[in-house]
Amino acid sequence: QGNYQALKECEKAGIQIVPATGRGVGGIPPMIRELPGANYAITTNGAVVADLKNNKAIKTCGLSNEMIQRILNIAKKYHSATDPFIDGRAITEPASIDHMDEFGLSPEMQKLIRDTREVVPSVMEYVKTTGAEAEKVNIFMADLEEREVLRKELMAIPELSISSSMYNNLEVNAKGADKGSALLWLA
């Protein structure tokens, strides 16, 4: 509540509020999106700069469809759950969402994932069929040693940037998709 009041004070002072998150734009709480001073957001680790008032992306730095398929093929060698973020929403499949306990996710995180994922029969088939680009690919790992092996394998691809917001995940973005670069572009 104190943070929200501070944001309201920024708004009164004419300061632009720019939420920056690893989530898609839909993951920004409505109470923040609806602040009059929040006109733009930086989402999916900087892959998207979104115009919140007109509900559209104004800058993107995404992963090509071919690169998404490459990432998914690499990740499937490990006990992982992959969620590409496509058009502002996370895509998952039953094999991932039905086995979240295996990835050490708390009940609260499991609820958040269920509430924010679109379940399709097969992530790979969805990616191939749509031909879509992705803002990022989130990968949950069951084995932390495998996570480090996978991180190194993905870091060897120069077009990628790898980060993590949890002890058991990897977030794969296109090189150049980061919150700092997105904020500088917006400025």
What are these regions (language model features)?
Residues 3-105:
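Active-site phosphate-binding/coordination module
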Residues 2, 64, 177-181:
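Charged helix-capping and loop-helix junction motifs
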Residues 74, 78, 85-187:
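Conserved acidic, metal-coordinating active-site core of Asp-based
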Residues 2-3, 150:
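Residues at alpha-helix caps and immediate loop-helix transition turns in enzyme cores, especially N-
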